[in-house]
Structures are given as C-alpha cells and as structure tokens.
C-alpha cells in the first residue's frame, strides 16, 4: 500500500515553522490594534457567485485558479481565493457599514490552483486589512504606511514601494480603448495569453510575465495619459502624503494588480532580501466593490501580504542580520527546563513538579520515555533547554530535584521538590 501524501501545493505547517508564523501574527495583531483595526474571521467556503461578481469573470483567478464545486444542495461553492470579497460580504450581511466606517483585519488560508513554487502554494495564507468607508487620499497614505511600518517592524529590509493610479471607471475605459487600438496594430508581437486577453481583459496584459510582451509595452500608452484632472490631483495628494511621512516610492505606470475591483491607488511593496525584488504585500482602492456586491456605494481600500513569501524573506533577513528583528522572530524558542526522570516514585514526583513549574509561568518539557539518563540528556540538549531537572531513585528518596545548567557554566543545585518558589527563582536566574 502506497504511503499517503498531502495534495500537491497543500503544505503541512510543522511546529518549528509555526513558531515563527505565530510570532509574526502576534506582531501584526498588536500593530493593527494600535491602529484601530479589529479582527474579522470569515468562512473558507463561499458561494462561487461572490468571487465571480467581486473579482471579475475575466480574471485569471476566476477563469483558471478557483477551487469550485457543486455541493449536495446543488449550490455552487468555492474555497476563497482571496480575502477582500469575503470581508465585504460579511460587512454587508451583518450591517456593519450602518455603524460607520469599518477598519478590519484578517488572517487565514486562501486557495488557488497555481503552479506551486517557493513562497507560493495552492493553499496559501494571507494577513490583510480592509478599511471600508475610507474615501480621502489621506486614508490611502495611512493604509500604505500601515503595511510599510509592519514590514519594517518585522525586520524586512530592502523595501521598495511601487504605486500607480488606476483612476476612475471612466478613466480606465478611455485607456482601455486607447490600449486595445495600439495593441491591435501589433498582434503578431503579442504572446498567446495576451492575445486572448485583448478581447476580455486588456488591462491584464500590462501584468504579462512574457519578456517580449513587456518590452513591447514599454512603447505603449500609459494609464497616466488617460487620467482625468480630478484623478491626477488625487494621486498627487497620495504622493505628497507619502513624501511627508518619509516613505520612498517609485511610480510604476504598468502596475494594475490582478483583480478587477481596483481603482485609483494601487500599490505593491517588494523586498530584495531574496536577491531579486520579490513582492511581499499588495493592495489598493476598490470604491466600486461594495456596490457591486449589493451594498450602497462605499469607498474602501486594503492590502494583503502572503505569509509563505514573507517567511522566506524573514529567513533571508535573519541570515543577513543575526541580531536583527527578523532573527528574533525566526529563532526557535526553547523550554526553560527539561525534566529528566526515571523510576516509579521519581516519575510521579516529576509530574507534580512539572505541573507546578508550568503554573508558575515557566516552559517545561517532561521526558516521558523512561529511557536511560544518557538518552534523556541528549534530548534535553537537542531541544535547547537552559536547565535539566533530574529526578532519579536517589533524588526521589530525598524528595529533592537536581538542577543542572545546560546552556551556561555553573554548578548543579538541589532543592526540595516541594520548594517550587526556590526552583522557579533558580530557573529564572540569567
């Protein structure tokens, strides 16, 4: 019988990885709390129509990448491929917008049928924020700064912010007409995917990964040429706000993002920690999405970062700076003590002692193997515990425990098993 394996692109998260994962989430949670964002959790499974209406029928996500099926009730269901549409659906369903603007954040798994590669899996995880009801250019600046400051706090180096304005729907329609006319004269120079997109979603051609197409687009008209004066003024205000905060940025007229609901400000933050610039966060404004999903016209802006890519970046940052913030996040935490025990009476005492030390706030690992002391000491060394607490027949007869330092120089000490306070004080001594 063959060994069962996880599905391709569905990756198990093991304890060592999750320690860093949870540390990142803890930093993000506190960062969002200080900024007035509340957490929201939405189901993994939604109606397929939510994403068709929200993301756009002509996108790669809806057309090629969604995990969709019909359930036993003949309902079309989809595992969520992104978080924004679900957050908006929840806000509308529960009447949150009737209470005013909503600042929300989320974290969790998403699903897309893509080719798995480093930092990108078919089940992937995101942390994201959505500010529903935010209209001004100043709110764009605040949301971008929220992402920039979080990445800096995590210790990600080599950050670069790219921004663009996608304007209003009228601006984009004018640009679409100009772009299609220009590209139709050069059909023989387009790759197959771009030719297919020309009639369905021509703006997505700007995001083509084909090098020849990208070279061709260098000569194409840009969205900036089609922006109305109001859209230009708004984008100027965003740039002025970022400059005032000291956040450097680069204008990228080809930046369109991968989902149809974006308009006005769009942005991506990249890092060079992996060698080439790799996107770790992206987002933008989506003023039409809430109305598109059945709500009143409401402005909104948000972003999401990919956890898998972020962890790769943090590992590289930790290697580059072993004393930096990223290194502290990546480091595996070790227990304060490892309890080595053998013999019936000693094992009973070890259980009682371990429980008392944990209640006092210490991280204590109890060896339950009953194996020889030598093997237990090796396990204590491997886990990185600062102290070994030794209970054998001799110690049990005296109702004592021997404390042996493992990570620093020092002499063994013995305390009565019942003297929890003295043991705790010793274990907490640097």
From Swiss-Prot:
UniProt-listed PROSITE patterns: AA_TRNA_LIGASE_II
InterPro entries listed in its UniProt record: aa-tRNA-synth_II, aa-tRNA-synth_II/BPL/LPL, Anticodon-bd, Anticodon-bd_dom_sf, His-tRNA-ligase, HisRS-like_core, HisRS/HisZ, HisRS_anticodon
GO cellular component: cytoplasm
Annotated keywords: Aminoacyl-tRNA synthetase, ATP-binding, Cytoplasm, Ligase, Nucleotide-binding, Protein biosynthesis
Source domain of life: Bacteria
Principal localisation: cytoplasm
One MF annotation (Gene Ontology) recorded for this entry: histidine-tRNA ligase activity
UniProt EC number: 6.1.1.21
Similarity section: Belongs to the class-II aminoacyl-tRNA synthetase family.
Protein name, as recorded: Histidine--tRNA ligase
Organism in which the protein naturally occurs: Parasynechococcus marenigrum (strain WH8102)
Taxonomic lineage from the root: Bacteria, Bacillati, Cyanobacteriota, Cyanophyceae, Synechococcales
């Amino acid at each position: 019988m063959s060994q069962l394996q996880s599905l391709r692109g569905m990756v198990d998260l093991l304890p060592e990885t999750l320690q860093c994962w949870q540390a990142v989430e803890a930093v993000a949670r506190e960062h969002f709390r200080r900024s007035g964002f509340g957490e929201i959790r939405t189901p993994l499974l939604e109606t397929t129509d939510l994403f068709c209406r929200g993301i756009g029928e002509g996108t790669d996500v809806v057309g090629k990448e969604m995990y969709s099926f019909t359930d036993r009730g003949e309902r079309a269901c989809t595992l969520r491929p992104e978080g924004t549409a679900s957050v908006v659906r929840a806000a509308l369903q529960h009447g949150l917008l009737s209470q005013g603007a909503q600042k929300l954040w989320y974290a969790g798994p998403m699903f897309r049928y893509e080719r798995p590669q480093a930092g990108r899996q078919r089940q992937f995880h995101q942390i994201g924020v959505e500010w529903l009801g935010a209209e001004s250019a100043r709110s764009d600046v605040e949301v971008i700064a929220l992402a920039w400051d979080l990445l800096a706090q995590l210790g990600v180096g080599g950050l670069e912010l790219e921004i663009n304005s996608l304007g209003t729907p009228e601006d984009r329609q004018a640009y679409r007409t100009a772009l299609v006319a220009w590209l139709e004269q050069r059909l023989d120079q387009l790759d197959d995917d771009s030719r297919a997109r020309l009639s369905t979603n021509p703006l997505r051609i700007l995001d083509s990964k084909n090098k020849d197409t990208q070279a061709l687009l260098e000569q194409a008209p840009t969205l900036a040429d089609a922006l109305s004066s109001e859209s230009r003024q708004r984008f100027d205000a965003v740039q002025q706000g970022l400059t005032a905060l000291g956040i450097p940025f680069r204008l990228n007229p080809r930046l369109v993002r991968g989902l149809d609901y974006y308009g006005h400000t769009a942005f991506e933050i990249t890092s060079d920690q992996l060698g080439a610039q790799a996107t770790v966060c992206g987002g933008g404004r989506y003023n039409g999405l809430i109305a598109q999903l059945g709500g009143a016209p409401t402005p909104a802006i948000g972003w999401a970062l990919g956890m898998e890519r972020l962890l790769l970046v943090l590992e590289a940052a930790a290697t580059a700076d072993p004393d930096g913030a990223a290194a502290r996040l990546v480091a595996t935490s070790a227990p304060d003590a490892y309890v080595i025990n053998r013999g019936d009476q000693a094992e009973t005492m070890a259980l009682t002692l371990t429980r008392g030390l944990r209640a006092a706030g210490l991280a204590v690992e109890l060896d339950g193997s009953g194996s020889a002391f030598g093997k237990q000491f090796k396990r204590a060394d491997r886990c990185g515990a600062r102290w070994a607490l030794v209970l054998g027949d001799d110690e049990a007869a005296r109702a004592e425990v021997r404390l042996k330092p493992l990570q620093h120089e020092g002499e063994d000490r013995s305390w009565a098993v019942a003297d929890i306070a003295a043991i705790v004080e010793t274990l907490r001594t640097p």
